């Protein structure tokens, strides 16, 4: 039984035949595979190795906040869960493992600053660095002023920073004045 990106769908195994399907069920009983959501199973060893295929678990989900800050190395804090942004009106059943926190956004805010990256062999959607800084400012009271300040300092220390793009995103996300005040103090 081959695993594609550490995930197995029961439908693809059924196509291979009854024997393959029973082997998959036996692997679940023995603890080698874990049910992520209905019809999708994952290899335990590969899940614990690092990044998981978020697209398989939550289609069209975008890594945001702590997960995105970690990917872009904007903070030294490690995320306790995968933070995934989805459309506000969408309902998604989240599996018990891996731990995923959903953040709901309106469709016009959701699409600002989305890029695709390949991380540990998985193609994932994630917010770009400028959007991540704006999110840190927007949610500064929830994540803490110290984390927000660390993210801004790290961003400003990078040679590839793009202040005009940052301010454009900040205006769209309605944090332009607040971010402007931070930048006046920091620069």
List each model region and its residues.
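Nucleic-acid-binding surface
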Residues: 5-15, 23, 28, 36, ...
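Glycine-centered, phosphate/nucleic-acid-interacting loop/turn motifs that mediate DNA/RNA or nucleotide
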Residues: 31
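Active-site loop and adjoining helix of the penicillin-binding protein/serine DD-peptidase-beta-lactamase fold
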Residues: 2
């Amino acid at each position: 039984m081959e695993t594609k990106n550490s995930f197995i769908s029961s439908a693809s195994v059924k196509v291979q035949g009854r024997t393959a399907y029973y082997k998959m069920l036996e692997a679940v009983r023995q603890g080698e595979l874990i049910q992520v959501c209905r019809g999708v199973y994952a290899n335990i060893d590969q899940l614990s190795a690092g990044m998981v295929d978020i697209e398989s678990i939550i289609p069209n989900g975008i890594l945001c906040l702590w997960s995105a800050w970690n990917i872009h190395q904007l903070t030294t804090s490690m995320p306790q869960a995968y933070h995934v942004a989805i459309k506000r009106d969408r309902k998604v059943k989240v599996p018990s493992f891996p731990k995923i926190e959903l953040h709901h956004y309106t469709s016009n805010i959701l699409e600002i600053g989305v890029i695709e990256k390949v991380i540990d062999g998985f193609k994932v959607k994630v917010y770009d660095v400028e959007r991540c800084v704006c999110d840190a400012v927007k949610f500064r009271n929830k994540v803490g002023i110290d984390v927000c300040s660390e993210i801004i300092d790290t961003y400003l220390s990078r040679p590839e920073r793009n202040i005009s793009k940052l301010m454009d995103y900040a205006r769209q996300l309605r944090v332009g004045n607040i971010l402007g005040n931070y930048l006046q103090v920091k620069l």
